[in-house]
């Protein structure tokens, strides 16, 4: 998936996450995480974001994650929404869990 424009998904409300995305030169990934629960879950947030980027074959992206204690499913949904808004893709491929 190619990122071609800036996009935002989510809010800064409690238990939510704001994902800001912008294109960079491939194959660079610039991931910045700001989280109220970074000490406890920072590694898990980083792993979840990078795994989703790998799944959708995303490179050349700057991601700024402002987490306010969101569950992983919320983080993934916000990231998928931002990816769609920042690319020319119309739908994401469904996956079995």
Curated annotation (Swiss-Prot):
Q: Name one GO cellular component term.
A: cytoplasm
- Keywords assigned: Cytoplasm, Phosphoprotein
Q: Which residues carry this modification: O-(phosphoribosyl dephospho-coenzyme A)serine?
A: 14
Compartment(s): Cytoplasm
Q: Which Pfam families match?
A: ACP
- Kindly indicate whether the keyword Cytoplasm belongs to this entry: yes
Record flagged with keyword Magnesium: no
Q: Which domain of life is it from?
A: Bacteria
Principal place where this protein is found?
cytoplasm
Q: Which InterPro entries match?
A: CitD, Mal_deCO2ase/Cit_lyase_ACP
SS bonds (residue pairs): none
Stated role: Covalent carrier of the coenzyme of citrate lyase.
**Subunit comment for this entry?**
Oligomer with a subunit composition of (alpha,beta,gamma)6.
HAMAP family named in the record? CitD
In the record, the note on similarity to other proteins reads: Belongs to the CitD family.
Any idea what this protein is called? Citrate lyase acyl carrier protein
Name the lineage.
Bacteria, Pseudomonadati, Pseudomonadota, Gammaproteobacteria, Enterobacterales
* Gene name for this UniProt entry: citD
């Amino acid at each position: 998936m190619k990122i071609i424009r800036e996009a935002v998904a989510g809010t800064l409300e409690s238990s939510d996450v704001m994902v800001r995305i912008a294109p960079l030169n491939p194959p660079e990934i610039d991931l910045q995480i700001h989280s109220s629960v970074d000490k406890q879950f920072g590694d898990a947030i980083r792993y979840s974001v990078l795994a989703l980027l790998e799944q959708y074959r995303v490179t050349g992206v700057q991601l700024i994650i402002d987490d306010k204690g969101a569950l992983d499913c919320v983080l993934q949904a916000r990231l998928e929404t931002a990816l769609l808004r920042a690319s020319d893709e119309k739908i994401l491929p469904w996956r079995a869990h």
